[in-house]
From Swiss-Prot:
This is Protein IQ-DOMAIN 23. May be involved in cooperative interactions with calmodulins or calmodulin-like proteins. Recruits calmodulin proteins to microtubules, thus being a potential scaffold in cellular signaling and trafficking. May associate with nucleic acids and regulate gene expression at the transcriptional or post-transcriptional level. CDD domains: IQCD (cd23767). Residues 257-267 have a biased composition (Basic and acidic residues). Belongs to the IQD family. Residues 115-133 are annotated as: Calmodulin-binding. PANTHER family: IQ-DOMAIN 5-RELATED, PROTEIN IQ-DOMAIN 23. GO terms for molecular function: calmodulin binding. Binds to multiple calmodulin (CaM) in the presence of Ca(2+) and CaM-like proteins. GO terms for cellular component: cytoplasm; cytoskeleton; nucleolus; plasma membrane. GO terms for biological process: response to calcium ion. It comes from the Eukaryota. Residues 1-43, 176-208, 242-301, 381-403 are annotated as: Disordered.
């Protein structure tokens, strides 16, 4: 009895000691579990309170909460492992319901740990979702800001381009208006010059042909000058007119005969024919009575030169460089003066110079005339007066005025 009593008593004591140890251990576990339960509650409360704080602070708080949960889970795992070790070491001695109670406690602690882990994961997922939503909102705001900036830049570029196009169109219109004004002014200028100078409106070809025609007329006039002078000499001789001859002839030299001219050298003959003369050294022949006046045809070098000069000097200069009326009247008076053909019985063969101007003499072609020919004298010969008159008419010269 005593042995069995001690045995059972020791067993009871050992059971009591084991139960006291288990209680202590379970109290530790309960404390750790309570602390783990309280920590998530505190963390959840802190998360709810700090929703308005910055994201960095929230992240730090969540990291601290997860660290606390991990520490609690680690302590719970250590406690469970120690309980399992103790129960496995005393398994041969414990035959009653003590082992079942310890297993039940371990299952409860594992369930709690799993629930705590699930709660922590939910908290983390919720916080991560919050951060993702916030980042998405920030990204959307950034995209909107970029769109606004780009739209402002595009609108500014479009306005600048439109302003440049308007400036270009305005410049083009101004250039067109200036060109139209210049063309209108040039047309008005040409019309005014055509009114002032009719020859300027004709083409250069017509002007050239006109100059050539004037030259031909002047050459024809030179050819027929001798015959006209013969007729005028005969008519003046037949009329009852008294001619007065100026006796002042200091520089007069009679024309040599044809034989003498043939003996002269060509150079000397050219110098004698082309010598300049003026009113001072030219003979003056006049009449006291009324003289027979023949119309003067100004188809000479002066008209030819005036027509050609009019081609070059009219219509190609501005209005302020055009010839005035007084200048044109002066040129007209100098180029085509009123001439009176004066014939004397003497064989002078010269015309009077007008207004003291110098001019050159050109002899009539003597080869086309034959002094002794019967056709020239009208058949037969003639008396000495008629011979002298024909010879003087033959040797007359016509002048070309220098304008």
């Amino acid at each position: 009895m005593g042995f069995f009593g001690r045995l059972f008593g020791s067993k009871k004591k050992s059971d009591k000691a084991a139960s006291s140890r288990d209680k202590r251990r379970w109290s530790f576990t309960t404390r750790s579990s309570n602390s783990s339960k309280r920590a998530p509650a505190v963390t959840s409360a802190s998360v709810v309170e700090q929703n308005g704080l910055d994201a960095d602070k929230h992240a730090i708080a969540v990291a601290a909460a997860t660290a606390a949960v991990a520490e609690a889970a680690l302590t719970a795992a250590h406690a469970a492992a120690e309980v399992v070790r103790l129960t496995s070491g005393n398994g041969g001695r414990n035959v009653g319901g003590g082992g079942n109670s310890s297993v039940f406690q371990i299952g409860r602690s594992n369930r709690r740990w799993a629930q705590e882990n699930i709660a922590a994961m939910k908290i983390q997922s919720a916080f991560r979702g919050y951060l993702a939503r916030r980042a998405l909102r920030a990204l959307k705001a950034l995209v909107k800001l970029q769109a606004l900036v780009r739209g402002h830049i595009v609108r500014k570029q479009t306005a600048d381009m439109l302003r440049r196009m308007q400036t270009l169109v305005r410049l083009q219109s101004q250039a067109r208006a200036r060109a139209s004004r210049s063309s209108h002014s040039s047309a008005s200028f040409h019309s005014s010059t055509a009114l002032l100078f009719p020859s300027s409106s004709s083409s250069p070809r017509s002007l050239h042909t006109r100059c050539v025609s004037n030259a031909e007329v002047s050459s024809l006039d030179h050819r027929g000058g001798s015959k006209r002078l013969d007729w005028q000499a005969e008519e003046s001789e037949n009329g009852d007119k008294i001619l007065e001859v100026d006796t002042w002839k200091p520089h007069y030299h009679p024309k040599p005969l044809r034989s003498e001219r043939n003996n002269e050298s060509p150079r000397k003959r050219q110098q004698s024919l082309l010598g300049p003369r003026s009113t001072e050294n030219s003979p003056q022949v006049g009449s006291s009575g009324s003289r027979r006046r023949t119309p003067f045809t100004p188809t000479s070098r002066s008209e030819y030169s005036w027509g050609c000069n009019n081609y070059y000097y009219s219509g190609y200069h501005p209005n302020y460089m055009a010839n005035t009326e007084s200048y044109k009247a002066k040129v007209r008076s100098q180029s085509a003066p009123k001439q009176r053909v004066e014939v004397s019985n003497e064989t002078s063969g010269y015309k009077r110079s007008v207004q003291g101007q110098y001019y050159y003499y050109t002899a009539v072609e003597e080869e086309s005339l034959d002094v002794g020919s019967a056709g020239y004298y009208g058949g037969g010969g003639g008396d000495s007066d008629r011979l002298n008159r024909n010879q003087s008419a033959k040797s007359r010269m016509h002048s070309s005025f220098l304008v």
